[in-house]
Amino acid sequence: MLLSTWTPGCFQGNKILLRSLITWYYLEFMPKLRPFYFLFYLTLPSCATDSPPISDKSSSIFLPLAQQQQLVHWMMPPRFRCQDYLLPLLLALSPAAAAAREVEYHHCHCDGGGGGGGGGLWSMDSIFRRQKVSDLLIAAAYFSIPLEILYFVAGLRHLLPFRWVLVQFGAFIVLCGLTHLLTAFTYEPHPFMVVLLLTTAKFLTALVSFLTAITLLTLIPQLLRVKVRESLLWLKARELDREVVLMKRQEEASWHVRMLTHEIRKSLDRHTVLYTTLIELSLVLGLTNCAVWMPAAGEMCLTHELRRDGGGEDGVVGVDDADVVEVRGSDGVKLLGPDSVLAAASGGKEEGTGAVAAIRMPMLKVSDFKGGTPEVIQTSYAVLVLVPPAGKSWGRHEMEIVEVVAGQVAVALSHATLLEESRAMRDRLAEQNRELLQARRDALMANEARQAFQGVMSQGMRRPIHSILGLVSMVQEEALAPEQRLVVDTMARTATVVSTLVNDVMEMSADSRERFPLETRPFHLHAMIRDAACVARCLCDFRGFGFAVHVENALPDLVVGDERRIFHVLLHMVGNLIGRTEPGHVTLRVRAADDDVLDDRLGQRWDPRWPSYSTGYSSVKFVIGVKRQQNGDAGSPLSRRPSGKGIDLRLSFSMCRKLVQMMQGNIWAINDPQGLPESMTLVLRFQLQSPLTSSSLGGSFEQKHSSPSCQIAGLKVLLIDDDDDINLVVARKLLEKLGCVVSSPPSGSGFLSSVGSSAAAFQLVMVNLEMKRVKALDVATRISQYRSGRWPIVMAMASDQKAWEKCAQSGINGILKKPVILQELKDELARILQST
């Protein structure tokens, strides 16, 4: 019913009204678009030609002319308002165009035929046909645009945020095409349904157009940002182009630097390096001349130049020159002025030359490359002067090339200096190597001499002394008179001291240092004093001295200490006193010292740190003094003055002091007015030994009347030693003295065959670890492999303490230290038999 009330004139008026409303909305909310909608408003009546002709007038829809003029004046920007005379003309044309559209076509006499009855080119029928074809083509074009958009835009994911805009735009285009398609059916008589569809299509087109315009409010700022971003990207591209140009220049400069560095480092001669630098720089930078000025004795001397005709007369510039001071005080390239003396001396004042540049080159020292704390060395600088041709200016890249090349030249010169120093060092090392080889040969010869000395000492002194000690120990077991026993015990103790001294000498020759090992064990102090007094009496009688000994009765007897070292020190004290003075009388006093603090002749205080006698320790004081005769018989054969030097005695006294200090004691001497020793005092602190353990005393030379153990008697012993001298005989006699049955192979090399032939014949094997032709440790190892059960027991004889540790790893049951003494042999055999 509503549709039936719509007439063509009413429909045309509503369309114009709708467009007016849309125009008002955009002009109200978007003032910047007023000029464009003004033009749209002027062309609005002419766009109505696609509507069918209507019979009634609809000019009442438009505003009056005055109001239309005001509306256009409001819509026009201020810059267009100056031309107000155009507004009446434009407003007059707009109603005329609308009126021409609203009248029926058969009242139009446009083709001159009137009524549209003519058949010319511009007849109404021809115009309608052309409009119909145009509408169909426009519709086809509109319909093809969405297809093209779908074909080209469907796969672009970055346009997904704009898909709603694309949908609206596509709908707008489709509806516009549909409007033109329906309009093509209105040029001929058509039913009302076509008009209704056309109206609906136009309404939807207007609605979609309105929505699309609203959507563009949010899209246009984004497009503007894209434009701004495009501008920024364009600026960034220009900056990148400039950076690429700079990078190319830097790459070119780097290539030149690498080439120059390669040429400079080809040689390690300083003159070749400098001349190569001058030549290559002149080729790369196109220089006229290059010069190198070296410091020498407060002046700068021209040492290297590309061409010699450009230098000064003498080629010398003072180091206090302003340009020289400025160049040497800066790191970069400095341009010299036109009045520079340095530039003139380098050929910079000639015709055809440009601005002269100069740079310093540090002359690095060899000590700069050595490790450790660097030395404070004043850096020396050379000056490189560059003379370009006329018209050439120094750019930043050229200056960078010069700076890098100057650094490379400094490094190359330092390498050349280092090479020269290394060559000199190589020569010195070669000389030192020759000296070391000579020292090595001398050391080998000294080692051979030392080994020969040790061999002579071992064969000529130690082995005979060991034999003497063994024989003396056998004599001690015999029934002797008291005087005889005193002499024998003294001989045994003296031989023990000599053996200890020989061992000390051999150890010092092997280790090249003084070593005095102590062997602390229980001993009888009274017997040791008695033997020392006996030897001292013999020495005094030989030198024409009288001798007396006084021993305190309260002196302890069983003490713990190293009796050999104490005996040695006492003999040294006696020898030192009687060796430097005229004949007189020697007195030996031995007493228990008090616990108070004792002072020596040097004022040094020695405070015993051990407990008193009642707590198990006792201090013993030995004082040996000499009283010279006023009128000695110089012609007596017993009065002989030794010819020893005082320095030797002082050295010997120093060694004795060291021994005493190792035993936690002290020793000092008192001299007379002539500087000769008058008395010597020795203070020692001993640990007391309980009488219950007197049976464990070792090394005592008193007579033992106990008979051999029943286990030792009849023991079958195999004695292995490749030496056929007196030592083997003494060892055999000692074992036979204890009641053992002793056998020995012909040599050490035949030992294994003896063991294989009579495996159960021996109960004990004694091996000498100091055999020459056979390694005793290998023999002991083979014995431990062949034996089974409790056979045989292995015991080794050695004088070297280092060999004792190896014996425990080789399966040796016991160690007997040389010299072999009867009582020690008996005690060791008893211990081994008891433990196994």
Swiss-Prot record:
Keywords in alphabetical order: ATP-binding, Coiled coil, Copper, Endoplasmic reticulum, Ethylene signaling pathway, Kinase, Membrane, Metal-binding, Nucleotide-binding, Receptor, Transferase, Transmembrane, Transmembrane helix, Two-component regulatory system
Residues that span the membrane, as ranges: 137-157, 166-186, 204-224
Catalysis: reaction(s): ATP + protein L-histidine = ADP + protein N-phospho-L-histidine
UniProt GO cellular component terms: endoplasmic reticulum membrane
GO molecular function: ATP binding; ethylene binding; ethylene receptor activity; metal ion binding; phosphorelay sensor kinase activity
GO biological process: negative regulation of ethylene-activated signaling pathway
Membrane topology: Multi-pass membrane protein
Domain Response regulatory: 718-834
Residue ranges of every copy of the Histidine kinase domain listed in the record: 457-691
PROSITE patterns assigned to the protein according to its UniProt record, in alphabetical order: HIS_KIN (PS50109), RESPONSE_REGULATORY (PS50110)
Domain of life (superkingdom): Eukaryota
UniProt keyword Cytoplasm present: no
Domain GAF: 269-413
InterPro entries associated with the record: CheY-like_superfamily, GAF, GAF-like_dom_sf, HATPase_C_sf, His_kinase_dom, HisK_dim/P_dom, HisK_dim/P_sf, Sig_transdc_resp-reg_receiver
Kinase as UniProt keyword: yes
Required cofactor names: Cu cation
Coiled-coil region(s): 416-452
Annotated cofactor note: Binds 1 copper ion per dimer.
EC code: 2.7.13.3
Family to which the UniProt record says this protein belongs: Belongs to the ethylene receptor family.
Annotated protein name in UniProt: Ethylene receptor 3
Taxonomic source organism: Oryza sativa subsp. indica (Rice)
Originating gene: ETR3
